[in-house]
Amino acid sequence: MTAVLPEVLVLGAGVSGLTTAVCLAEAGFPVRILAELLPHETTSFCAGAIWSPYLVSHPHVDRWSAQTLKELVGLTGDGRTGVRMVTGIEAGRTPVEPPEWATKVTDFRLCTGDELPDGFVSGWRYTVPVIDMPQYLSYLSERLSTAGGTIDKGRADALDPAPITVNCTGYEARALVPDTGIEPVRGQLVVAENPGVAEFFAEHDHDSPAPTYYLPQGGHIVLGGSAEPGRVDRTPDPAVSAAIVARCAAVEPRLRGVRITGDRVGIRPTRPTVRVEHVRENGRHVIHNYGHGGAGVSLSWGCAREVTDIVGAIDL
């Protein structure tokens, strides 16, 4: 590596782009984010979110998710971050086994029958980070600024505008790369005042177009969700929101008649496998970091650390 660290351009200001930029800046690299959507406009802003590395494929997923879990747990003591450790239940309407990652987290145990909501026959309890994404993205933005990084609003029409570019554009990578392997999955959730719910709930049915979950985040609670492949509009659908509230209230009666404060809609960038890869484009270096589906938060720090290692090994 040269004595003076080269500037790195990060494309995308969602959780993957911000986390990657933070890691690079704190490692000493001059970093600039260029993003068509600022953090509060991204799909990441619309996420629930909970650490749950589900429906993602890559040989390094276990390592990335474990690294991210460690980072998030370390942030729970800082009230600025929006990260809290929350206990809850994941349950299935049919007999299901817990994923291996769930068995390794804090307080894991199988549920007894009387702990399960009506209509559910299997489940498990555990404690994991739940993340208030608007607050968390603000924290990451401030952390980036403190480390000397900047965020500019703008659109990249090519992958190689700088000697080193990190592509964290999510669904937009479909056109930018181009990568037709990326498929959009529209997700919608509801934000409401929290009537006193302290534990999360998540339905274990990854094939459902309407997965039921709720995530308490202090004074408010996030209710979900939906999964609509191929749909890319981000206008909230009132019928979807009403169905979400009804399903969540069937699990937790205190959510009946809850006061709704907003809706969020995002486009998950699903792909057969996560792409974290270093390639050369027109003599310049491009490091891809996209295709995380609904697990962008859960893999964010692990992928960002790997990108930082890749950049650190480049000799210009």
Annotate each language-model stretch with its function.
Residues 139, 258-316:
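C-terminal catalytic lobe of FAD-dependent flavoproteins
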